[in-house]
A protein has these predicted regions:
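N-terminal signal-anchor transmembrane alpha helix
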Residues: 1-28
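Extracytosolic (periplasmic/ER-lumenal) interhelical loops and adjacent juxtamembrane/interface segments
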Residues: 27-58
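Individual transmembrane alpha-helix segments
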Residues: 47-82
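Membrane-interface loop-to-helix entry segments
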Residues: 58-68, 117-135, 181-187
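Cytoplasmic juxtamembrane regions at transmembrane-helix boundaries
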Residues: 75-101
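Small-polar-interrupted transmembrane alpha-helices in polytopic inner-membrane proteins
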Residues: 91-108, 156-165
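Membrane-proximal helix-loop-helix units in multi-pass membrane proteins
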Residues: 97-139
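Terminal transmembrane helical module of multi-pass membrane proteins
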Residues: 137-212
Length: 212
């Protein structure tokens, strides 16, 4: 369990690297407008999708980070399967996190400016699969009466993320808000695995009576 939890906590590197790669841009980068995937684009170009210039000098660094994130999510979920409630609901949630991690790997090997079709498919699998995993795992935890805070976070955070994903796909606000909705849709998926990993690590050292 410890290795799986550490893998999930290691997902935090995603956010650190995101800021580092963003800081290397010489063209304007906006969290409201730019897609997350713009950081991993292999070429410099004008993006019709977000109506701005995209040029990421450290795109390889971003892609390595995303690859590690996908592997950590998927492998961590497999190793942590028995750490969650022994229910069909929990198993489905864990399985969806494996799928979401694999979706991130697909994103990495298919940069948005090289193979757009597979890239978009991988993004949808990673984000939508991860959102479903959050909600389903949250429900499983609430039903089992274990880690209620995590359960509520999964259901509430997942629901907000789903709404944001709908806004992303509907392109509400146009290009000016594409990046904002995408981040609200995708970031909770990663934040939740970090929180779950931390909780499981803390449970290794805390008395059982204090785990509610």
């Amino acid at each position: 369990m410890t290795v799986g939890a550490l893998l999930w906590v290691a997902v935090i590197q995603y956010f650190v690297v995101l800021l580092v790669v963003q800081s290397r841009w010489t063209t304007p980068y906006s969290w409201a407008r730019n897609a997350i995937s713009d950081l991993g684009a292999a070429t410099c170009r004008y993006s019709d999708s977000v109506e701005t210039w995209v040029c990421s000098p450290w795109h390889r660094t971003a892609n390595v980070s995303w690859l590690l994130t996908g592997v950590c999510m998927a492998l961590g979920a497999l190793l942590l399967a028995k750490s969650f409630p022994a229910s069909r609901t929990a198993r489905i949630g864990v399985g969806l996190y494996v799928l979401a991690g694999l979706g991130m790997v697909v994103v990495v090997v298919n940069p948005e400016d090289v193979r757009a079709g597979p890239h978009v498919l991988g993004s949808l699998i990673a984000i939508i699969g991860g959102e479903a995993a959050m909600i389903i795992l949250g429900v499983a935890l609430l039903r089992a009466g274990y880690a209620r805070g995590l359960g509520l976070l999964g259901v509430a955070g997942g629901t907000i993320a789903v709404i944001a994903m709908v806004l992303t796909l509907a392109r509400v606000g146009g290009s000016a808000y594409f990046g904002l909705w995408e981040r609200i849709a995708g970031f909770p998926v990663l934040i939740y695995v970090i929180c779950c990993g931390l909780r499981l690590l803390f449970d290794r050292v805390r008395p059982r009576a204090a785990r509610q």
